[in-house]
Amino acid sequence: MAFNWPVFKTRALSSVVFVAVMLVGLMTSPWLFLLLFSVIHWGCWREYQSMMEKIQPAYRDISPFHRYGVIIAGWCMMVFASSDHWKIGNVSFSAIGFWIGLILIFVLPMIEILFSRAMDLKNVRTSALGLLYISLSCSLMVNLRSGWPFIGDFSDELLQPLNSTTATYTGFLVPLIIIASIWINDTMAYIVGSLIGKTPLTAISPKKTWEGTIGGILLSVAVVTLYAAFVIKSSWQHYLAISAISAIAGTFGDLLESKIKRMAGVKDSGSLMPGHGGFLDRFDSLLVAVPFVWLYAVAFM
């Protein structure tokens, strides 16, 4: 695959915008981060439902209560995953998300039975898979940002080790490493694959090559680990592990979404960003990487 400078320029500019938006959400406050991922969650769900309607025509017959109720239920998962320190009156924001979500779990199936044109368990399964694919990942990302200790100014935290005792900032840095690793992997995989890629990775995504995939992962891990070792002079093991998990799992996320698009017969999931398609095209890697990074963070950090 020959290197295409105009395509790369478009992809790079879109990636810069993406990273800038994500950094604003990370740097300002957990509230803004929740708002940002609420928008991402909504966009991913609408594109997911649109593609599922092409793959499974019966899904077009779900009621509006089902269509939007499941998105609200997924958003409640995100609220539940947020910090217990956020309160409305004397009630924690997390508890509000839990109880509204619990009510929806019981109400939505009854609404599906009463108002859908045809009750089809496949439709319920499709929505349940959407909750697992989209809502769970967004919830865990919010949990990493808001549910973990975070104090201090972000500019100081970028220059302190991950296991620092002088500032508890895991809630900022872990999401940052995920986003940076995926962005570097995506960019480097395209460059390496364009320059030296010859061996197709899979028929699901014909333009991807083994050379580009391996090169992207290795360069992503190298950049993040070297940053830890030489810029902030930190213990680099956590950085290496999180960047490797993000890059590898993110690649599988990219392939998964490519498979869904192929089944739906569409080139892009939407038209959010030039060179990157829709919400799912932009966040496919993140959706698969986050649960694995979250498990690592809970187990080892």
Task: Describe each region flagged by the PLM.
Residues 1-209, 213-245:
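Membrane-embedded alpha-helical bundles of polytopic integral membrane proteins
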Residues 105-106, 270, 287-288:
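Hydrophobic alpha-helical transmembrane segments of integral membrane proteins
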Residues 216, 282-286, 301:
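A short, conserved beta-to-alpha structural element at the edge of catalytic cores
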Residues 261, 286-288, 292-293:
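C-terminal transmembrane helix pair
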Residues 295-301:
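Juxtamembrane boundary at the C-terminal end of a transmembrane helix
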